[in-house]
């Protein structure tokens, strides 16, 4: 949550006072407008839900995301070999989600501690960096998964070479490099700040000092790493749906998995990514250009809505495991097989322990002369 240190000008300050002594009324009105636009900063009015909503969402995301992505990584590493191309992308997506959920306990404590950051400036920067790496890494890997499925559905024969695991590994490495390089400025812009009450805030965007340049950077990343992938995904899904309609794929596994993929990915974008990017941009714009007394109430609403979308943006770490289960190559079948095998192994271990206990107890009974066994 961005803790903006904005000093407020009292509402009772009149135009003549702002213009300064000795000015005519007309000049004082113009001067007062200039003074307000240049020095006035709205003081945010924060409601109680903002301090409880985000930690509640983060707790939910941590529990579900940790369990879901742990199982997914376990499956990909031990039960999904040899990997297909789409399995490579899904493994990297699960890895990005898992790294993000590991950072959530510190953020949960931050909000329960009345947004007083105690972990230092470096940890604050790392926290915000990993969030953005997960955000844009997830978007790019979902784009890769969508393009991969598009090639398999629309050009099943021509794409055989392009769908190989080796190509998917190279593309995944490239995605990680692009994301890390593109998000590295976050390590400069984010950080901690001291409030008037001496508590420490951890900026999720940046301080007012760097706000103008951060807005430009944010718009560039939004266009390059959100808007462009979204257009590509929509194009792939449009062509996939068209191919499914005109090709004879009734009740085939490829048709079913493709439909699940379209539904899940579009849901993630509609619920998590689109609202977050829209409200983040509006919040930054409000901090920069909407600082007048008449706009303060509007800014409060924008800020509150932005906090809601921040929670929604983290939900993708819970939804992605559903994608592996429904749209992955043989993931559901192999998960069922792995759980049955683990269950049988557990039953065998329990039976073995029971037999060992019986063998250990039997001599004692015989030694005591008890033959009731």
Curated annotation (Swiss-Prot):
Main location per the UniProt record: membrane
Binding site for ADP: 46, 203-205, 283-287, 303-306, 310
Pfam family, one: 7tm_1
Membrane spanning residue stretches: 52-74, 88-109, 126-147, 167-188, 215-237, 261-284, 304-325
Glycosylated residues, chain numbering: 11, 27, 113, 197
Keywords: ATP-binding, Blood coagulation, Cell membrane, Disulfide bond, G-protein coupled receptor, Glycoprotein, Hemostasis, Membrane, Nucleotide-binding, Receptor, Transducer, Transmembrane, Transmembrane helix
Ranges of the Extracellular topological domain: 1-51, 110-125, 189-214, 285-303
Topological domain ranges for the Cytoplasmic compartment: 75-87, 148-166, 238-260, 326-373
Role according to the record: Receptor for extracellular adenine nucleotides such as ADP. In platelets, binding to ADP leads to mobilization of intracellular calcium ions via activation of phospholipase C, a change in platelet shape, and ultimately platelet aggregation.
Name by which UniProt lists this protein: P2Y purinoceptor 1
